Amino acid sequence: MKEDLSVVLVSNRGPVSFVQSDGNFQTQRGAGGLSGALDWAARQLGEHSIWIASAISSDDKEAMETGATEDLPEELGYRVRLLDIDAGVYDQYYDAVSNRMLWFANHCLWDELHIESFGQRELDAWNNGYEPVNKRFAKVASECFEQDALVLFQDYHLATAPGHLRKAHPGQAILH
C-alpha cells in the first residue's frame, strides 16, 4: 500500500544498525557523514519521510525477522525499511562493483588502476549483483511514495536505480 510521503531516502547504509545483546536489539547510529546529514533531514520531515537501506549485518537481518525494526519510527521519528539482500549478491553489488570499480571511477582514480577493459568476472558481478540490487531498490522505492514525493538516491552504490525508477514512473521527482 502506498503511503502519503514527501521524501523517500534511499541509500546502501541506513541511519542505524542493530546490535543484539542478551536477546534484545539495540540500535547504533549509522557510520559516516551520510547518516548524520540525512537523519537530520528525515527527522525534520517526520512521518512524511521513509529511509530505505540494506540490512547489512546478521543482526540487522535478525532484527527484521523478529520485528525489532517496527520500533524505529518511535525511536527515530520516521520510518525505515531495510532490504535483506542475499550475501553473495550483496558481495557482487557492494564489493566487486561499488568498491572495486565505481569507487575509483567516482574519485577520478580510474587511470591509477591501469584497467583498459573488464573481464567476465566483473561483467557477472554487474549483471548478477549490482543491477539486480539497484532494480530492487528502485522497485521498493516505488512502493513507498505517492506521485508528489521526492525520491533521493544517495551515492554511487545506487547509480542505476534512478534510471530503473524513471522507466516505471516517468514523471517522478528523482534526485541522485
Model-derived regions: residue spans:
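Catalytic cores of carbohydrate-active enzymes across secretory and cytosolic contexts
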Residues: 1-176
